[in-house]
């Protein structure tokens, strides 16, 4: 049965065979920090003169607080101390926010026009796939997912993706200016800056990335020799003309298969911290008619924007509105007894003991089984932004191994420890009602070409 799905995935993406023991699933922000130990980068550079470090982040997020301390100003001392030949700091800038639009859109929400959103952490032959950034809360009180892959081939593939996007990004270099850094477009970058010529930038990006996304043809793939396969899935819609991204087509392949008779009585769990799945993803989930299914989202009190000032402070209410609309769709399809929406809350954000929820992904369990055989982990939130404006990286695990399936089931369960079911009555409560100003703000963002 899994072969029906993998045969279609083989047409879309490279495939890597791994042993189940090569995949480790981390549970908590603290465990993520202890595994990554990002604070040791400087120490490692000092101890090993042969070590080289390459960091790719987003230009809009990474410079937002300038001239106050920001990602760019915090990282650039590494370049100053160890030199450009050993430390490379790159920041990707979307081609969708330029000129007058960039000047008028507030910095706090300008990421709604596109980000470098991939979360990849590679050291030697190990790779961590996650949805987590490297800010303090992701190491302390922000729940996410973290999978460690001990595979040289898989790590090398994502390193090639990383380097290709680096060459389509600005370099961050030391400067005596107040900000402490300068953002430069290197002459050896293969194309022009996205701020100067977005169209030519896209043409070069397509030439650089398209072949990497589709390294192996179906004819080159032999029957797998292990119980576990990993498919790298990438969504580079803002860069590719035409769009040959692989994440959305793969998700479409899996969810469409679930709606066929062969997969009747399958089940799934879907989660996204920011609950704004596209209409297509919502339809695919609902049309799968699962035996049972769970959707996990952040409650407003576990949303990172809760209590923010200005337009961003409206986002928790906007996501509540979208959750209510999802339940309306579930009800109209007659699936209320099969699909449960749960909201995750652990205290209240910005209060002592309060956490935020940022996990995202999919688990699929085959008919008449109790543990998932398929899991998708990575950066995507499955939103309009993910599929039109952001750069996303994910790993799709397909396994027949019972021990790995058990670990995936445990992950699926522990993410629900702080989640409770909500129904349509919940959204009728006074504190959950959404004002007209929120609806207008949602409409305005769309009109200006952005997305939640």
Predicted regions and their residues:
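Active-site cores of enzymes that catalyze phosphoryl transfer or operate on phosphate-rich substrates
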Residues: 1-30, 184-254
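A generic local structural motif
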Residues: 107, 255-256
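Short glycine-rich, low-complexity/disordered patches
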Residues: 174-181, 225, 421-429
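PLD/PLD-like phosphodiesterase catalytic module centered on the HKD motif
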Residues: 1-127, 132, 136-141, 146-156, ...
